[in-house]
Amino acid sequence: MISVMAPGSEKTGKVETILKKRVLLAISGGVDSSVAALLLKEEGYEVAGVTMCLGVREEENKVRCCGREAIEDARGVCEILGIPHYVLDYAPLLETCVIDKFVREYRLGRTPNPCIDCNRYLKFGHLLDSARTMGFDYLATGHYAKIERKESRWILKKAKDLVKDQTYFLYPIPVAALEHILFPLADRTKDEVREIARQALLPIAEKPESQDLCFVTQDSYRDFLQEQGCPVHPGPIVDRSGRVLGEHSGTVFYTIGQRHGLGISSPFPLYVVAIDVAGNSVIVSGKEDVYAQGLVAGEMNWLTPERPQEAEARIRHRKRTCSCRIVPEGDRIRVYFAEDQDAVTPGQAVVLYQEDEVLGGGVIEEALHYAN
């Protein structure tokens, strides 16, 4: 039996005594998850790697994670580290849990965040269930985030590397699941992680980060949406008075706050401020109309037993947080910003923080403007 500091325990003082505690690590073949595996092994855990196969056709293997090349990279790292490697076929789950919603949201004129849904349903839903079924004590990933013990409960916090912090994408983790999840990179920076990979002579040490949607193998998401049957009908681009200024190529190709690619001549910059799917029109206006005083959010997931009245809100990944007031409305909330926020986009997430702790989050349904 060996004693090791549980990840984050240097902050909580918790020492975990483990008898080869078993960890299933989601490994994509990238540097983050590979170093996470190495760190867990060095800490004394019994580690196995698992890669989700998302069903990309080999002749179209342009995917940056979870494709054939990624699976081979993950397998190679596991061999170097001397740990088992599993591949689970998650293609049907990806289709029903992520892609179907992705397409449906665009049909409704919203801009979804499929990475959040992947975390919600696949990684910290089905994969966590699989880990427990397979006899593992924990599921670990290479996310930059931190889980700590606070009094009698587990909390989700921002990572040490605030530039790489991924808590915006992790708010849907069920609160009861936090105690079964490990984030080995919680107190590492990206530069430190790459250096660890170099020192360990891992072949993926210089591998670039994935940027694209993992399930879009075409040159652009536009092609993907058309393949999925999204209606693409040209229509008018209008100002708030209804005056036609130009023509759009399909409402699914536009998002709130978009400025470029409108094809409109104007003496001042114009931005997309609304998408009218029923009328097949895109509404544009000046920069001042991009700002909102608040939002309505649904599909809430709370990670704290108390419902806060004030918090810091983040409406996009890497956008700075702003102070806000929270008003509950049944299973939804209204969020009122201390400072107006630009491009509040239905379909994206709003995540609520108290200092470094994630309080919860939800899906933006509506932006609130002064005229409402």
Curated annotation (Swiss-Prot):
EC number(s) stated in the UniProt entry for this protein: 2.8.1.13
Active site per the UniProt annotation: C118 (nucleophile), C214 (cysteine persulfide intermediate)
Keyword field contains Chaperone: no
Record-annotated disulphide pairs: C118-C214
Places the protein is found: Cytoplasm
Keywords: ATP-binding, Cytoplasm, Disulfide bond, Nucleotide-binding, RNA-binding, Transferase, tRNA processing, tRNA-binding
Binding residues for ATP: A26, I27, S28, G29, G30, V31, D32, S33, M52, G142
UniProt superkingdom: Bacteria
Alphabetized CDD domains for the sequence: MnmA_TRMU-like
Cellular component terms (Gene Ontology): cytoplasm
Marked site positions, Interaction with tRNA: H143, Q348
Residue segments, region Interaction with tRNA: 164-166
A GO MF term: tRNA binding
UniProt catalytic activity: S-sulfanyl-L-cysteinyl-[protein] + uridine(34) in tRNA + AH2 + ATP = 2-thiouridine(34) in tRNA + L-cysteinyl-[protein] + A + AMP + diphosphate + H(+)
Main location: cytoplasm
Pfam families attached to this UniProt entry: tRNA_Me_trans, tRNA_Me_trans_C, tRNA_Me_trans_M
GO BP, sorted A to Z: tRNA wobble position uridine thiolation
Function: Catalyzes the 2-thiolation of uridine at the wobble position (U34) of tRNA, leading to the formation of s(2)U34.
HAMAP family: tRNA_thiouridyl_MnmA
Family as reported in the entry's similarity comment: Belongs to the MnmA/TRMU family.
NCBIfam families: PRK00143.1 (NF001138), trmU (TIGR00420)
Entry protein name: tRNA-specific 2-thiouridylase MnmA 1
Source species: Syntrophus aciditrophicus (strain SB)
Gene this protein is translated from: mnmA1
